[in-house]
UniProtKB/Swiss-Prot annotation:
Residues 31-55 are annotated as: Disordered. Signal peptide: none annotated. The chain crosses the membrane at residues 6-26, 343-363, 418-438, 456-476, 497-517. This is Membrane protein insertase YidC. Residues 31-47 have a biased composition (Low complexity). GO terms for biological process: protein insertion into membrane; protein transport. Belongs to the OXA1/ALB3/YidC family. Type 1 subfamily. The gene is yidC. It comes from Vibrio cholerae serotype O1 (strain ATCC 39315 / El Tor Inaba N16961).
Length: 541
């Protein structure tokens, strides 16, 4: 197998990979937790959605007072009617490149609703009816984390039937995790029974993305049985989410490209999963078991809301397996170390584009023995071509005999006929893993390289990098020896750089940069290896 056929192999693998990823995003399998509840015979958790008024509140934020809470990284709008987070702006992430507007993750507008709701339900619950929720009292209309202050607390109070309810939001400097604590003081003269719920509500939208950049927008969850499982909007429409009673819920989330929102129960091993869809609005959340509070006693319910970018270190510290929302696919065990190495390099060079170049040299340097073995094997195969041709003329159409004698010749000459193919197959997982490492890295979002590349996570606006990449492939093709004589195969090989260029027009600039630099390294390594082969008497042409 010569290097031009390797290019064809890469192309086929690349196209197959892209089609598979697009299918995987579109056809996500049903959640494993539900399947376990059905297959093991364990009784599923009771449907919490039956406890709530099935009519969702319509634009609640427009009907009630909202307060603003600001830290260095978050600006939240909280509705005093129920204490829902109806808007979340990420102060350190812009909506668009060079835009002064912060990225809005949660919002409650006429065209789109994505909010984080939490409340108390049960016999003495105050949030059972969507349109009759508690009107909390709060001391001010806005709260700001002051300079030198590390924590900001916003208590909201409500009193009904002799029971005092306090809902407190706790935000910390530099953190996208918001603690939500309910304190209940029962002075009603009798027992009070209630539990907490917390869910995310969102319009059920399409996943988005394209063939080059397939992205997932939908739900996900983690339990003691399932470390990470996607629960798509289509799944949500088809069946309500539930899990066995003995399963511990780690978190539930709604995720999108680069960003995630999640509810994490605190000290509640019996919290239950649930979901429901009403009028194209999907709820996905957790429900804690009821607590019975004696007269004169107090109780506390707590959950944490993550609302921010997919930052792996912070998410891993917030909840078990929450960092898995950074989905590297089935080659995560390669992609995760690559992302770690890329981040380490960036801390030294200060530019993500330069870090990608350095990573490319490191990866290609590590794979140099494979590359050398590939070219050496191809050179040996070319040296055998006269003998193979003579063998074909001598044997004729007897394929079985031809195969036997070919294998004997390979064994005698110590040549592996797959030696030129296997190295390139081993390199493909590296490329695919790096593809996902770059695709899922929020750090690359709006990160510049130099010149016209202002965002490594977006396609090249002038298509210069893809064109350079295509040109480099053409040069590699011309420099590579070939034994292809079939006219059709020759046409396919000639067209291959054009096809690659077309595909890469829509790839993130960071990934195209990697492929371009990788091609340049290939040209350098190819030149050095050919010179070494010529010295050994193995012709490179």
């Amino acid at each position: 197998m010569d290097s031009q056929r390797n290019i064809l192999l890469i192309a086929l693998a690349l196209v197959s990979f892209l089609l598979f990823q697009q299918w995987q995003v579109a056809k996500n399998p049903a959640p494993q937790a539900t399947q376990q509840a059905q297959s093991t015979g364990a009784a599923p958790a009771p449907s919490f959605s039956d406890e709530l008024d099935p009519t969702p509140a319509q634009n609640v934020a427009a009907k009630a007072k909202t307060i603003t809470v600001s830290t260095d990284v978050l600006t939240l709008s909280i509705d005093t009617l129920g204490g829902d987070v109806v808007s979340a702006k990420l102060n350190q992430y812009s909506e668009e490149l060079n835009s002064p507007e912060s990225f809005v993750l949660l919002q409650n507008t006429q065209g789109h609703q994505f909010i984080a709701q939490s409340g108390l339900v049960g016999p003495q619950g105050i949030d059972v009816t969507s349109n009759n929720r508690p009107a909390y009292q709060v001391s001010a209309d806005s709260f700001t984390l002051a300079e030198g202050q590390d924590e900001l607390r916003i208590p909201m109070t409500y009193q009904a039937n002799g029971i005092d309810y306090t809902k407190t939001f706790i935000l910390k400097r530099g953190s996208y995790a918001v603690d939500v604590v309910f304190d209940v003081a029962n002075n009603s003269g009798s027992e009070a029974t209630l539990g907490m719920y917390a869910h995310l509500r969102q319009n059920l939208l399409d996943s988005g993305g394209n063939l080059a950049m397939p992205t997932y927008r939908g739900g996900a969850y983690s339990t003691s049985d399932v470390r990470y499982k996607k629960y798509s909007f289509d799944d949500m429409k088809d069946r309500n989410l539930s899990a066995p009673n003995d399963v511990t819920v780690n978190w539930v989330a709604m995720i999108q490209h680069y960003f995630a929102s999640a509810w994490i129960p605190r000290d509640e091993p019996q919290a239950q999963l649930y979901s429901r869809v009403i009028n194209n609005l999907g709820d996905m959340g957790i429900r804690t078991p009821n607590k019975t509070i004696a007269n004169g006693d107090k109780a506390e319910f707590e959950a944490t809301l993550w609302v921010g970018p997919k930052l792996q270190d912070q998410m891993a510290a917030t909840a078990p397996n929450l960092d898995l929302v950074v989905d590297y696919g089935w080659l995560w065990f390669i992609a995760k170390p690559l992302h770690w190495l890329l981040s380490v390099i960036q801390t030294f060079v200060g530019n993500w584009g330069v870090a990608i170049i350095c990573l490319t040299f490191i990866v290609r340097g590590a794979m140099y023995p494979l590359t050398k073995a590939q070219y050496t094997s191809m050179a040996k195969m070319r040296m055998l071509q006269p003998k193979l041709q003579a063998m074909r003329e001598r044997i004729g159409d007897d394929r079985q005999r031809m195969s036997q004698e070919m294998m004997e010749l390979y064994k005698k000459e110590k040549v592996n006929p797959l030696g030129g193919c296997l190295p390139i197959l081993l390199q493909m997982p590296i490329f695919i893993a790096l593809y996902w490492a770059l695709m899922e890295s929020v750090e690359l979002r709006h990160s510049p390289f130099f010149g016209w590349i202002h965002d490594l996570s977006a396609q090249d606006p002038y298509y210069i990098l893809p064109l350079l990449m295509g040109a480099s492939m053409f040069v590699i093709q011309k420099m590579s020896p070939t034994t292809i004589t079939d006219p059709m195969q020759q046409k396919i090989m000639t067209f291959m750089p054009v096809m690659f260029t077309f595909f890469f027009l829509w790839f993130p600039s960071g990934l195209v940069l990697y492929w371009l630099v990788s091609n340049i390294v290939t040209l350098i390594q190819q030149t050095l290896i050919y010179k070494a082969l010529e010295k050994k008497g193995l012709h490179s042409k």
